[in-house]
A protein has these predicted regions:
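Bacterial N-terminal signal peptides that target proteins for export
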Residues: 1-8
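Extracellular glycan-interacting surfaces
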Residues: 8-12, 18-339
């Protein structure tokens, strides 16, 4: 499947006729994906990596620059033509839907792993990177490190999320645990101690007090008080890495975990019990990331350098959904203007 480089503004306009005759989705799905199976330096294979947008007909279109190192993307809720990516060479920003880009960080902030626009103050952007946490209060023009309360050793930060219901509350997943800030990242306190890196932290779309987290090899956890304390999911294995966790926005009891070792793990009772949901997926079940479509409840799973797969019954059966040869680093569902 060929992928085209198309500016986002033009891309959205071109989709309107397709949307009219296709499924009326209220969310657009973006993925950050490296589509580079079998590629080596010097190879003549053409790859198209970076940000991809699912079209109304189910096909995928490339948006912006060709970069296999884009780990995450976050949009300005006031203007979806403005968004930020976390990539190998720093935090990048576009203000014209991906037509042009600017690296906004300097030499001392590289290889960020996650980026998050503050929904309470969209001029503020948070960045998780190997050296800790950085914040911009001017839409990425300048960055300040905000690490008070983080340890000198163990502040490598993999993921960062802003509490959508509490202004100033942020949760960060670091190599030494989960840290909570209640003052716009001016200070941090540890609320979960782990011996391995916290790979993902997510807030429930149903109850803002509920958060879930997964780790490199220290299991998975749930918080029912806004991240102030955590309890382990007893039935989730902890011997190997868990890459991410996703809530089902259409069903409060459903959660899914993606793991390179265990494949897809699913719960339909709020995390009390978990089952592998790999039947029908190619072996080995090397799941890179999972996501859940807020329009349909469709479970999505990225098989490392294989393809994207989808399930309409939360993992009991699967079918291929494109992006051959890809490894998806993140799923982002963005409310669209047709909502």
């Amino acid at each position: 499947m060929s992928l085209k480089f198309i500016p986002l503004a033009a891309l959205l306009a071109s989709f309107l006729p397709l949307i009219a005759i296709g499924q009326d989705r209220t969310y657009d799905l973006y993925v950050c994906a490296a589509v580079n199976r079998n590629y080596v330096i010097g190879s003549k294979i053409t790859t198209t990596s970076g940000l991809h947008l699912r079209q109304a007909n189910g096909q995928w279109a490339h948006v912006g620059i060709n970069d296999p190192s884009i780990f995450a993307v976050s949009f300005d809720p006031r203007d979806h033509n403005t968004f930020y990516t976390a990539a190998l060479n720093g935090a990048l920003r576009t203000v014209n839907g991906g037509d042009s880009w600017r690296v906004t960080t300097s030499w001392d902030i590289t290889e960020p792993k996650d980026v998050c626009v503050d929904p309470h103050n969209p001029d503020r952007v948070y960045l998780a990177h190997p050296g800790g946490i950085a914040v911009s209060d001017d839409r990425g023009m300048t960055w300040t490190k905000r690490e008070r309360g983080l340890p000198d050793r163990g502040k490598y930060t993999q993921t960062i999320e802003v509490d959508r219901s509490r202004k100033g509350h942020i949760l960060a997943g670091c190599e030494s645990g989960i840290y909570l800030s209640q003052n716009d990242a001016r200070s941090w306190r540890k609320t979960l101690v782990t011996e391995e890196t916290v790979n993902d932290v997510q807030q429930s779309p149903h109850d803002p007090d509920i958060w879930a987290a997964v780790t490199q090899s220290a299991g998975a956890y749930i918080s029912r008080n806004g991240g102030r304390s955590w309890t382990a999911f007893d039935q989730v294995p902890s011997e190997a890495a868990l890459y991410n966790i996703a809530f089902d926005p259409t069903n409060p009891g459903r959660l899914a975990i993606g793991s390179y070792t265990y494949g897809v793990l699913a719960s339909e009772d709020g995390g009390a019990t978990w089952k592998p949901r790999n039947e029908g997926l190619p072996k080995p079940h090397r799941i890179w990331r999972v996501g859940v479509d807020p329009d349909s409840g469709t479970l999505l799973a990225s098989l490392y350098q294989k393809a994207l797969y989808e399930s309409s019954d939360f993992g009991k059966t699967w079918k291929k959904a494109g992006l051959e040869g890809s490894a998806i680093n993140s799923f982002v569902f963005l409310p669209n203007s047709r909502k």
